[in-house]
A protein has these predicted regions:
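Alpha-helical tetratricopeptide repeat
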Residues: 3-136
Length: 136
């Protein structure tokens, strides 16, 4: 009985990993709606994983759903605040909504995590220009 339960548990883990991989493949081939469907299935099973939240945020961004992308990226950040790409995605989603001050805050955090990425610095400067904060 114990052996059967361990096989079922291992199989469930494999299926979630497979769903994430399938969603990322669909994302790679620009099939954003299909990728969202895969990530929705993963999130229904394991909402505590940060990666499907991030991947779904990417898909929503490419579908011009910037509010949904920001929301999913926020959830991914809540689950794992150490990935600078999530802050970048949320900042870009906020820029598209003209939430420049929030985007600056995201870029501040991304720069703290990885100061060698020049696009973080440039995008933060562009946000500050839009806010007319020329002294910073």
């Amino acid at each position: 009985m114990v052996a059967l339960l361990s096989v079922v548990k291992a199989n469930a883990q494999y299926n979630v990993d497979r769903l994430i991989m399938n969603g990322e493949v669909a994302l790679h081939y620009d099939d954003y709606v299909l990728s969202i469907q895969y990530f929705n299935k993963v999130l229904a099973l394991k909402p505590y994983l940060w990666l499907p939240w991030y991947d779904r945020a990417v898909a929503k961004f490419y579908l011009d759903d910037y509010i949904g992308s920001e929301s999913d990226a926020t959830k991914a950040i809540d689950l794992n605040p150490y990935i600078e790409q999530i802050f970048d995605l949320r900042a870009i989603s906020r820029i598209r909504q003209e939430k420049y001050q929030d985007a600056v805050s995201d870029y501040d955090r991304a720069i703290r995590l990885n100061p060698s990425v020049s696009s973080f610095w440039v995008n933060r400067a562009i946000c500050r220009m839009n806010l007319q904060e020329f002294d910073q």
